[in-house]
Regions:
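Conserved SAM-binding loop
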Residues: 22-31, 36-124, 135
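Membrane-proximal basic amphipathic "stem/tether" segments
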Residues: 210-248
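Active-site rim elements
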Residues: 123-128, 174-178
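Conserved Class I S-adenosyl-L-methionine
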Residues: 122, 128-155, 162-166
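Class I SAM-dependent methyltransferase Rossmann-like catalytic core
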Residues: 1-22
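Flexible, glycine-/basic-rich loop-and-beta segments that form/coincide
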Residues: 158-223
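Amphipathic alpha-helical segments that form well-ordered structural scaffolds
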Residues: 10, 136-140, 189
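A short alpha-helical cap/connector motif
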Residues: 3-6, 159, 238
Length: 248
């Protein structure tokens, strides 16, 4: 998809001031749109963000990735736990074995490293194999003991980009028609902690069924109402059909 100006701002704000910035790795090799309309290589962007080394993984060698690998398969042992940032800027939807792509992202991250997935959510028919639901990322990385799980719904319409914070654990479900005619993406991040077990993460059970049938305690209804009314419900129609989202 390339890294848009809005995506660059989301990456920078997510990185913030915390965490080491030694090595970053990306899925795919992408061009980055700048504010003055130019394009730069992704290595320049991540270098500006403080990373000393920027590596990449791709299936084909054409764009000169650092590692020519198939993300449908487990990544080699010598790459595991080595990266302070793992950035998937729209590769996962093109891989048939999407769960393994997420496992690989988790495996590549170092302790205290950050994983970011920026992938299609709605209105991307036939762009790749899949469009994704927010609960997939919260349930997978939650089950893998990652922390600081955050997501923004990223709206793209021509040259206008905007976003809304969203958390399926406390917010009510997003309407199926979210975004109207705009393209909608998930911008999700999670941090790997020392408590994350070594080896490949397992398969999660979807959160709604863990609470309905598995005895897991759900977030209280009052908390849902409070959070939802503050962030989503009060302006649902406006926000999802053209107004109220934060402009990038």
């Amino acid at each position: 998809m390339g890294i848009s100006r809005g995506a660059s701002k989301l990456i920078a704000s997510t990185l913030g001031e915390s965490g080491p910035r030694r090595r970053a790795i990306t899925f795919g090799v992408q061009r980055v749109e700048t504010d003055d309309g130019r394009e730069i290589h992704q290595d320049e962007l991540f270098g500006r963000l403080g990373f000393g080394t920027v590596e990449s993984i791709d299936y084909y060698p054409d764009e000169k990735p650092t590692h020519v690998l198939d993300l449908n398969l487990p990544v080699p042992a010598d790459l595991r736990g080595q990266f302070d940032l793992v950035y998937d800027g729209g590769t996962m939807e093109h891989c048939f074995n999407a769960p393994q792509v997420m496992r690989n992202a988790a495996l590549l991250a170092a302790s205290n490293g950050l994983v970011i997935h920026h992938v299609p959510m709605n209105n991307w028919v036939d762009h790749g194999f899949y469009q994704f639901s927010p609960t997939l990322f919260f349930d997978f990385y939650g089950a893998a003991a990652f922390e600081d799980l955050q997501m923004k719904i990223h709206f793209v319409a021509r040259h206008r980009e905007s976003y809304l914070p969203y958390d399926p654990r406390i917010d009510l479900p997003v309407p199926y028609v979210a975004g109207g005619r705009r393209k909608v993406l998930i911008f999700f991040s999670a941090r790997k902690t020392a408590s994350v077990k070594s080896g490949e993460p397992g398969f999660p059970i979807q959160g709604r069924y863990r609470t309905t049938f598995g005895g897991e305690r759900a977030t209280s209804a009052s908390a849902v109402r409070k959070t939802f009314s503050g962030r989503l419900r009060a302006s649902l129609r406006k926000r999802f059909f053209g107004w109220g989202a934060r402009v990038l």
